C-alpha cells in the first residue's frame, strides 16, 4: 500500500496524464479490449471453432457484412445459417456463398431491430463494416463526418420467427449480433424468440457506440437474465467469465461478449 502511495504521488499528476492514457490503452489491450480485425485477430475464430465442435443446428448472423463469420460456420459444421445484412454492396458479396451452400445458407437484405419498417443506415463508403442505424454514430470522432446513408428494410427477429415457423422445430445454437451500437435494440426485438427457443449463445460486439446510447454490459445482462456473461480473448480457447456489475468490465472499448444460457 505504501508503494502504491509513492506511485500515486509521483504519477497522479496532470503532467503525466497523456502518458498515463497511453499506458491505460495498452493495459486495455492486455485485458482483451480493442483487438480489431479479422476473425483470428479478434479471437472469434477460437470461439467459432468451439461452436462448430458442438455440432450446431442453426446459427443466426446479424450484421453479417460480407460473410466471413457465416462462411466459417458453414465450412466447419453442418449448421444452417440465417444471415442478415442491410447494406446492398455488402449483401451482394454475402449472397455469393448461397451458390455453394444453397441448402443451408439463407440470406436477407434487411436490418434487424426492435421495430418493423424502413430506416436510414449511415455508412462510411470506405469502411462499410462501420455502418449503423443510429445517429449517435456521428458522436464518434472517426465517424463524425459520415454523411452517406441508404434506406433499408428493418425487421425484428420475433417477426421473422412468425413468418418462418419452421424455426420453432429447430434448436438455435448461436445468435451473433454485430450492428455497431444497435445490439440492444436487436435483443429487444427478439424477446419472444429468445424465450421460446433459448439459444445457447448470444454474441454481441460491445464498443464506443454504447457510451452515447447509455447502454452498458449491466443493462444487457438485465435484459438477458437467464444468461451468464463471458468475454472472448484473442489468444485463448477458453472464455473468461465476467461480472457485468463491475466497472472494470464496462469500459466502452471494442470487445466481443458472449452470453451463455445458464
Question: Where are each of the predicted segments found?
Answer:
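Phosphate/nucleotide-binding beta-alpha loop and adjacent structural elements of enzyme active sites
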Residues: 1-262
Amino acid at each position: 500500500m505504501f508503494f502504491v502511495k509513492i506511485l500515486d504521488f509521483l504519477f497522479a499528476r496532470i503532467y503525466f496524464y497523456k502518458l498515463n492514457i497511453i499506458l491505460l490503452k495498452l493495459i486495455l489491450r492486455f485485458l482483451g479490449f480493442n483487438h480489431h480485425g479479422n476473425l483470428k485477430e479478434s479471437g472469434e475464430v477460437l470461439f467459432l471453432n468451439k461452436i462448430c465442435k458442438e455440432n450446431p443446428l442453426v446459427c443466426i448472423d446479424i450484421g453479417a457484412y460480407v460473410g466471413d463469420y457465416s462462411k466459417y460456420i458453414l465450412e466447419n459444421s453442418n449448421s444452417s445459417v440465417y444471415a442478415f445484412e442491410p447494406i446492398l454492396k455488402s449483401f451482394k458479396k454475402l449472397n455469393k456463398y448461397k451458390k455453394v451452400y444453397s441448402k443451408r445458407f439463407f440470406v436477407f437484405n434487411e436490418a434487424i431491430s426492435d421495430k418493423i419498417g424502413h430506416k436510414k443506415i449511415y455508412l462510411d463508403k470506405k469502411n462499410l463494416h462501420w455502418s449503423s442505424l443510429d445517429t449517435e454514430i456521428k458522436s464518434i470522432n472517426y465517424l463524425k463526418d459520415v454523411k452517406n446513408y441508404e434506406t433499408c428494410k428493418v425487421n425484428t427477429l420475433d417477426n421473422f420467427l412468425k413468418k418462418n415457423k419452421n424455426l420453432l422445430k429447430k434448436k438455435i445454437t448461436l445468435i451473433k449480433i454485430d450492428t455497431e451500437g444497435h445490439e440492444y435494440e436487436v435483443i429487444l426485438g427478439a424477446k419472444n424468440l429468445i424465450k421460446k427457443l433459448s439459444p445457447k449463445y448470444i454474441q454481441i460486439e460491445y464498443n464506443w457506440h454504447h457510451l452515447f446510447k447509455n447502454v452498458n454490459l449491466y443493462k444487457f445482462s438485465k435484459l438477458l437474465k437467464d444468461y451468464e456473461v463471458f468475454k472472448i480473448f484473442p489468444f485463448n480457447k477458453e472464455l473468461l467469465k465476467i461480472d457485468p456489475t463491475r466497472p472494470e468490465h464496462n469500459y466502452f472499448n471494442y470487445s466481443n461478449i458472449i452470453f451463455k444460457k445458464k
